[in-house]
């Protein structure tokens, strides 16, 4: 009986190993030789930063703990990512750290202090961590960004005292309100929050990441993939010239999201973005979306060639840095989406990593 049990146990273990092996191997694949490419390799601007979307708006949570996050930071480091950006430290009632102020306002207590975790992992892997400000949701409800200033006055102070003074990896601030056009209260709100971020932290840099109101700027919850009324390059330039003129003293960089315009429009909009940033002494980044806006199911990892076209346009237009939204869901070998690990491999092939 004992021999039979041992035999069955060994058989079951062997079967489990056979099933698990392809899954585990897929997380550690070796990219194919770059010689298989029929386009010039490494012609795009490499991605050196990523958002961390742990207070998710419309993407499923992966429910990672410290071990999974540690592994993901290592995957990021292996392809040259040196900047990680918490996209928001809270959204409505869900928060990433035990904020005394926000808890008193009725927010829910988080089970883990993610800001501390991200700062520690950034320190471990030689990266810089940027803190995304709190999003109360009132701007999305009203269209008036000035509502976001009040809560963030307290959040900025809290975060700096808890993490900024503690970790050398704390490297900057992301002013998380997203706009695309002239928006009520936006200029003054960006100025106010940017100024406070700089004052409490001794001048650490700040950035914003707006979207371009192009043909793909549609409601994420809707079924439409495009719209007829899209901003022209000329109108985009006029409106963002006014915005940059009002915020450039306290906002150091602008990373326009690149997924709302078509691929044959990239150079026209990107060149305007770079011209405006240079005019006002700001850095011009691209937020290279690694999810696909062209698919009827929202959202899956992007086709590699679409990402390549966007990164190549950013390099042609002289952009300063490429960040992405976002590595962990759409590009990581351990993402819940199988396609993400394949995108990681194609990216490594293209850049010879």
Name every feature range the model reports, one short phrase each.
Residues 1, 23-43:
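C-terminal segment of N-terminal export signals and the immediately downstream linker at the start
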Residues 8-28:
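N-terminal export signals
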Residues 1-8:
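Twin-arginine (Tat) signal peptide motif
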